[in-house]
Protein backbone atom coordinates (compact mmCIF):
# COMPACT_ATOMS: atom_id res chain seq x y z
CA UNK A 1 0.00 0.00 0.00
CA UNK A 2 1.32 3.45 -0.90
CA UNK A 3 0.01 6.96 -1.40
CA UNK A 4 0.49 8.66 -4.78
CA UNK A 5 -0.85 12.21 -4.83
CA UNK A 6 -0.01 13.27 -8.37
CA UNK A 7 2.93 15.64 -8.92
CA UNK A 8 5.77 14.78 -6.58
CA UNK A 9 5.16 11.03 -6.54
CA UNK A 10 7.34 10.34 -9.58
CA UNK A 11 10.03 8.47 -7.57
CA UNK A 12 7.37 6.11 -6.25
CA UNK A 13 5.95 5.56 -9.73
CA UNK A 14 9.43 4.72 -11.04
CA UNK A 15 9.82 2.15 -8.28
CA UNK A 16 6.38 0.75 -9.05
CA UNK A 17 7.38 0.37 -12.71
CA UNK A 18 10.56 -1.38 -11.64
CA UNK A 19 8.82 -4.02 -9.52
CA UNK A 20 5.87 -4.82 -11.79
CA UNK A 21 6.79 -7.74 -14.00
CA UNK A 22 6.22 -7.70 -17.76
CA UNK A 23 2.58 -8.48 -18.45
CA UNK A 24 1.57 -7.21 -15.00
CA UNK A 25 -0.45 -4.16 -14.11
CA UNK A 26 -0.38 -1.47 -11.48
CA UNK A 27 -3.45 0.13 -9.94
CA UNK A 28 -3.92 3.38 -8.05
CA UNK A 29 -7.19 4.33 -6.39
CA UNK A 30 -7.48 8.10 -6.08
CA UNK A 31 -10.17 10.35 -4.69
CA UNK A 32 -12.15 11.96 -7.51
CA UNK A 33 -12.42 15.47 -6.14
CA UNK A 34 -14.37 16.63 -9.20
CA UNK A 35 -17.62 14.98 -8.08
CA UNK A 36 -19.52 13.42 -5.17
CA UNK A 37 -20.24 14.66 -1.68
CA UNK A 38 -16.90 13.35 -0.43
CA UNK A 39 -15.17 15.05 -3.37
CA UNK A 40 -16.60 18.38 -2.24
CA UNK A 41 -15.35 17.79 1.28
CA UNK A 42 -11.94 16.82 -0.10
CA UNK A 43 -11.73 20.10 -2.09
CA UNK A 44 -12.59 22.03 1.07
CA UNK A 45 -9.81 20.22 2.94
CA UNK A 46 -7.27 20.74 0.14
CA UNK A 47 -8.21 23.92 -1.75
CA UNK A 48 -4.99 23.88 -3.80
CA UNK A 49 -5.82 20.39 -5.13
CA UNK A 50 -6.87 20.76 -8.77
CA UNK A 51 -8.71 17.65 -10.03
CA UNK A 52 -8.02 18.59 -13.67
CA UNK A 53 -4.30 18.91 -13.00
CA UNK A 54 -4.21 15.55 -11.24
CA UNK A 55 -6.09 13.84 -14.07
CA UNK A 56 -3.68 15.34 -16.62
CA UNK A 57 -0.72 14.16 -14.52
CA UNK A 58 -1.82 10.51 -14.69
CA UNK A 59 -2.90 10.66 -18.33
CA UNK A 60 0.44 12.13 -19.49
CA UNK A 61 2.17 9.13 -17.96
CA UNK A 62 0.08 6.60 -19.85
CA UNK A 63 -2.33 5.62 -17.08
CA UNK A 64 -5.92 4.73 -17.94
CA UNK A 65 -8.86 5.72 -15.75
CA UNK A 66 -12.10 4.09 -14.71
CA UNK A 67 -14.42 6.37 -12.75
CA UNK A 68 -16.06 4.49 -9.90
CA UNK A 69 -18.93 5.36 -7.59
CA UNK A 70 -18.83 3.97 -4.10
CA UNK A 71 -20.00 5.17 -0.76
CA UNK A 72 -19.85 5.11 2.97
CA UNK A 73 -22.74 3.42 4.76
CA UNK A 74 -22.92 3.35 8.53
CA UNK A 75 -25.32 1.73 10.96
CA UNK A 76 -24.76 4.38 13.62
CA UNK A 77 -24.26 8.13 13.41
CA UNK A 78 -21.39 7.83 15.90
CA UNK A 79 -19.47 5.68 13.41
CA UNK A 80 -19.98 8.22 10.62
CA UNK A 81 -18.73 11.00 12.88
CA UNK A 82 -15.68 8.98 13.95
CA UNK A 83 -14.64 8.34 10.35
CA UNK A 84 -15.13 11.99 9.37
CA UNK A 85 -12.91 12.98 12.28
CA UNK A 86 -10.21 10.58 11.05
CA UNK A 87 -10.37 11.83 7.46
CA UNK A 88 -10.44 15.59 8.05
CA UNK A 89 -8.89 18.23 10.29
CA UNK A 90 -10.93 18.95 13.41
CA UNK A 91 -12.56 22.22 12.32
CA UNK A 92 -13.65 20.93 8.92
CA UNK A 93 -14.77 17.60 10.39
CA UNK A 94 -17.11 19.39 12.79
CA UNK A 95 -18.52 21.49 9.92
CA UNK A 96 -19.14 18.37 7.83
CA UNK A 97 -20.81 16.59 10.74
CA UNK A 98 -23.08 19.59 11.36
CA UNK A 99 -23.98 19.93 7.66
CA UNK A 100 -24.49 16.30 6.68
CA UNK A 101 -27.51 14.39 7.91
CA UNK A 102 -27.82 10.67 7.68
CA UNK A 103 -25.64 7.60 7.57
CA UNK A 104 -24.57 7.48 3.91
CA UNK A 105 -22.13 9.48 1.80
CA UNK A 106 -21.64 9.19 -1.94
CA UNK A 107 -17.94 8.89 -2.71
CA UNK A 108 -16.35 8.94 -6.17
CA UNK A 109 -12.89 7.57 -6.92
CA UNK A 110 -10.70 7.14 -9.95
CA UNK A 111 -9.18 3.74 -10.55
CA UNK A 112 -5.97 4.51 -12.45
CA UNK A 113 -4.22 1.55 -14.05
CA UNK A 114 -1.33 0.85 -16.35
CA UNK A 115 -0.17 -2.41 -17.86
CA UNK A 116 3.51 -3.11 -18.32
Task: Set out the residue ranges of the language-model regions.
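Conserved class I S-adenosyl-L-methionine
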Residues: 25-56
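Short loop segments at secondary-structure junctions
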Residues: 22-23, 116
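A short SAM/SAH-binding and catalytic strip from SAM-dependent methyltransferases
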Residues: 1-10
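Conserved Class I S-adenosyl-L-methionine
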Residues: 57-59, 64-116
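A short glycine-rich, Lys/Arg-flanked "PGG" loop and its adjoining helix->strand segment in the class I
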Residues: 10-22
Amino acid sequence: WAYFFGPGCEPGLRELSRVIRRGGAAFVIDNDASRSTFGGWFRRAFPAYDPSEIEAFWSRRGWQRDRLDMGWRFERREDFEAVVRIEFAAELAEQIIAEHDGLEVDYAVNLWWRAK
